[in-house]
Each structure stands twice: as structure tokens, then as C-alpha cells.
UniProtKB/Swiss-Prot annotation:
Descriptive protein name: Chitobiosyldiphosphodolichol beta-mannosyltransferase
Database matches in InterPro entries: ALG1-like (IPR026051), Glyco_trans_1 (IPR001296)
Function (record text): Mannosyltransferase that operates in the biosynthetic pathway of dolichol-linked oligosaccharides, the glycan precursors employed in protein asparagine (N)-glycosylation. The assembly of dolichol-linked oligosaccharides begins on the cytosolic side of the endoplasmic reticulum membrane and finishes in its lumen. The sequential addition of sugars to dolichol pyrophosphate produces dolichol-linked oligosaccharides containing fourteen sugars, including two GlcNAcs, nine mannoses and three glucoses.
Cytoplasmic side: 24-99, 121-464
Residue segments, region Disordered: 242-261
Membrane topology: Single-pass membrane protein
Major location category of this protein: endoplasmic reticulum
Molecular function GO terms recorded: chitobiosyldiphosphodolichol beta-mannosyltransferase activity
Keyword Endoplasmic reticulum appears in the UniProt entry: yes
Length: 464
């Protein structure tokens, strides 16, 4: 009797879904140029999914983009009438019971919530899904695809289980379960994209998943910032962050001055200050795969070199981003007592971030990759702005950073400090290594995202 009741209950739950799925299959035939894009994360901090949506819209698809709306996406996305952003509510874990139980309950409720949101959306010919996070979104999107006739496209940025392993250890039961889940449901997708050749090979060899490498490429708005816009940005940021403010007042009170630039009151001409500090930029999601103590130790060594009389500029170090370890590192930064270095950790508006990269003198990347198979998108954006980079070494970094060509690769804080000393010696030196790297980046004529997407992704969605 109990078994019969359970079967009846299951049928009662599944029948409406099957009927709704059948109707959505019929609807999908009438909306073949519609795509649903899903990221179980913050849309504003998921640039690659924003770029997918913009590229799809540019080529005639309408797009429904589902994700958390914690940060403002780029204006191009918000102003595109082919793209609809549907906000998801971030579910909080229960505060009772063992942590594993709390996590399990959260995953189940997230699955039901995402299923409900997807089933009441316009059906898409494709469901584009960012992974990670893939638990429970891969299974839910696959199930919805089965019901509605949509083809699941997984864009592999990394492995979710490897990120969990940084916190719990690689042999934790949750991590092993997540790995099995990711591998099992990942094989059920129709198309797979990934960010490096190393990941493509790993997916093929270990998970029997065939993927197409779609390298991260900078969007068109990542470019060198004109001096006038640099000045406006510095004046704006100076309102809330003291490192951007002028070190001294100009003789003419009508002259606008920042820490780096000034605008002549009469002519309106913007010039760089003769003894301006160097602007060093890093961006981060403040997670376990980025060790900012390396940068702080290198800055301490740089400070000592300056105090010892080496010909080095003052530094303004801007670390932008949001994430769980931000408060921890902010506390470490406040404990430092630099005389020639100022550090600030702003969260920038989407439109200001490319302007900052295009105004900086050097980028630093501390991303090491939990799997060793993904590449830091921040470096891609920096290269789009022709900004040279010092990046910490890991397994497949060579696919992006060419040592001594477009930047430098380091292993530890000692090596980073030596690189900072070499690059900023006699700053600003037109004949220095920093300007040579920038020249190489200008001459490389790298593909932009739209050009790369047309070559790699568009043929897949048009042919299938």
C-alpha cells in the first residue's frame, strides 16, 4: 500500500512537469532563436557569461540570463533589448544540524527553485550553463533540457570539486561525491566548451567529454584609457579613496590635480605629473586559490629597497574585487606601515574597471587555479588594455603569459619583488622593460571576444 502511494505521488508530481515540458517543446519550435543562459552565481561577476549573452544577441538570438543580481552587470548587457536578466534568489544554508546536512538541504532546495524558475521561462533551443558552480545546476539544466527539448551547453571554467577541495581537502566525502556528480552529469551535455587546451585534454582523457577550447578574450571595452578619461577616473576615485588624491595643492586653485594627473584650468589640457607614483593593479575574487600574502611580502621588500636609496617610485597598489577573504587580507594590509606605498581595495563599477586597467602601469596576478587547468580572466582583460602583467606560475599559465614577452612569471615573493624593482627602476623610463612589454602587447593584435566567439562558438550553435 505504501509503495502504491509513493508511485501515485511521483506520478502526480511528474505528470504536470511532463505536460508542461510537452507544451514547452511545442513552444520551442516557434522560438528556435532563443537561448537560456544560467549561472548559479553573481551575473555582474560572471563576465564570460555576459559575453556569451551579448554575442548570442549580436547574432540574432534572444537571451534569457538567469543568475544572482548582487553586482551591476555591464551597461551593454542592460541596454540590449534582446537580453532579459532574470534574478535568482540566493538561498541561505540552515543554521541547524551538521554542516553536511545543511549543505545537502541547501542543494535540494536550490535544485527545486532552479527547476521552477527554468520551467516557467520561455524555452530555449540551447541552455548555456557556466560550471562551476555546477551543483545542482548541471543536473537541473539537463533535466529541463530533456523535458523541453533544449540542448545543454556546459562552459567549463574549472572543476567545482577542485574548488571544494581547497576548503575540505581532496579526499573529503563531499568532494569525492561532487567529483562523481560533475563527471556523470557533465557527460550528458550536448556541447561542451572550456577555457584551455589543457582542460580540453583532461576532459577527454579522464571524463570522456569532448570539448571545444574557447579562450577567454577581452571584450571591446578593454583598451588603453585616454589621458583625459584617466584624469576623470582618478578624480572620481579620489572622492572615496585617498591614494588617488593629489599629494600637494596646485599653484592655481582652479587646476584639477589627482595623484597622477592634472588638468590645466585655462586650456583644459590633461598632463601626467612629473613625479607621479606608479599605479599597480590586481583584481581578485578573494578566494583560497589566490595568496595575497605573496604580494604584500613583495611590497615590503620593494619598500625597503626604496628606503635604501634605490631609484624607485612611490607605489599606489589597487586590489579590486569581492569575496570571502577580503576582510582577512584587508586586516593584514592595515597592519602594514608603508611610507612609499599606498594600498586600497575598492569594488569598482562595471564601467570603471576597464578604465582603471587601461590607466595602470602594471598588473599583478596571484591566481593559481584549483585544478591547474583554467586561466585567469583578469590577465586577459589586462592584456586587452595593453597592460603588462607579473603572474604567479602554475601548470598551464604558458597558454596565456609569455615570460619576457608580454609579462613576467614568478614563483614567490622574492622573485616578484625583484621583478617590481627591475620594471620600476628609473620610472617612468620610455626605454624600460615595462614599455617594451606594452609595445609587444600593442603589436600582438590579439583577437577580441566577438571575433573569437564567431570562429569557435557560432558554428556550433548554427550547425546543431
Amino acid at each position: 500500500m505504501a509503495a502504491s502511494c509513493l508511485v501515485l505521488l511521483a506520478l502526480c508530481l511528474l505528470l504536470p512537469l511532463l505536460l508542461l515540458g510537452g507544451w514547452k517543446r511545442w513552444r520551442r519550435g516557434r522560438t528556435a532563436r532563443h537561448v537560456v543562459a544560467v549561472v548559479l552565481g553573481d551575473v555582474g561577476r560572471s563576465p564570460r557569461m555576459q559575453y556569451h549573452a551579448l554575442s548570442l544577441a549580436m547574432h540574432g538570438f534572444s537571451v534569457t540570463l538567469l543568475g544572482f543580481c548582487n553586482s551591476k552587470p555591464h551597461d551593454e548587457l542592460l541596454q540590449n533589448n534582446r537580453i532579459q536578466i532574470v534574478g535568482l534568489t540566493e538561498l541561505q544554508s540552515l543554521a541547524v544540524g551538521p554542516r553536511v546536512f545543511q549543505y545537502g538541504v541547501k542543494v535540494v532546495f536550490q535544485a527545486m527553485y532552479l527547476l521552477w524558475k527554468l520551467m516557467w521561462r520561455e524555452p530555449g533551443a540551447y541552455i548555456f550553463l557556466q560550471n562551476p558552480p555546477g551543483l545542482p545546476s548541471i543536473a537541473v539544466c539537463w533535466f529541463v533540457g530533456c523535458l523541453c527539448g533544449s540542448k545543454l551547453v556546459i562552459d567549463w571554467h574549472n572543476y567545482g570539486y577542485s574548488i571544494m577541495g581547497l576548503v575540505h581537502g581532496p579526499n573529503h566525502p563531499l568532494v569525492l561525491l561532487a567529483k562523481w556528480y560533475e563527471r556523470f552529469f557533465g557527460r550528458l551535455s550536448h556541447l561542451n566548451l572550456c577555457v584551455t587546451n589543457a582542460m580540453r585534454e583532461d576532459l577527454a582523457e579522464n571524463w570522456h567529454i569532448r570539448a571545444v577550447t574557447v579562450y577567454d578574450k577581452p571584450a571591446s571595452f578593454f583598451k588603453e584609457t585616454p589621458l583625459d578619461l584617466q584624469h576623470r577616473l582618478f578624480m572620481k576615485l579620489g572622492g572615496t579613496h585617498s591614494p588617488f588624491r593629489a599629494r600637494s595643492e596646485p599653484e592655481d586653485p582652479a587646476t584639477e590635480r589627482s595623484a597622477f594627473t592634472e588638468r590645466d584650468a585655462g586650456s583644459g589640457l590633461v598632463t601626467r605629473l612629473h613625479e607621479r607614483p606608479a599605479l599597480l593593479v590586481s583584481s581578485t575574487s578573494w578566494t583560497e586559490d589566490e595568496d595575497f600574502s605573496i604580494l604584500l611580502a613583495a611590497l615590503e621588500k620593494f619598500e625597503q629597497l626604496t628606503l635604501d636609496g634605490h631609484s624607485l617610485p612611490s607605489l599606489v597598489c589597487v586590489i579590486t574585487g569581492k569575496g570571502p577573504l577580503r576582510e582577512y587580507y584587508s586586516h593584514l594590509i592595515h597592519q602594514k606601515h608603508f611610507q612609499h606605498i599606498q594600498v586600497c581595495t575598492p569594488w569598482l563599477e562595471a564601467e570603471d574597471y576597464p578604465l582603471l586597467l587601461g590607466s595602470a602601469d602594471l598588473g599583478v596576478c596571484l591566481h593559481t587555479s584549483s585544478s591547474g587547468l583554467d586561466l585567469p580572466m583578469k590577465v586577459v582583460d589586462m592584456f586587452g588594455c595593453h597592460l603588462p602583467v607579473c603572474a604567479v606560475n602554475f601548470k598551464c599559465l604558458h597558454e596565456l603569459v609569455k615570460h619576457e614577452e608580454n609579462g613576467l612569471v614568478f614563483e614567490d615573493s622574492e622573485e616578484l619583488a625583484a621583478q617590481l624593482q627591475m620594471l620600476f627602476s628609473n620610472f617612468p623610463d620610455p626605454a624600460g622593460k615595462l614599455n617594451q612589454f606594452r609595445k609587444n602587447l600593442r603589436e600582438s593584435q590579439q583577437l577580441r571576444w566577438d571575433e573569437s566567439w564567431v570562429q569557435t562558438v557560432l558554428p556550433l550553435v548554427m550547425d546543431t
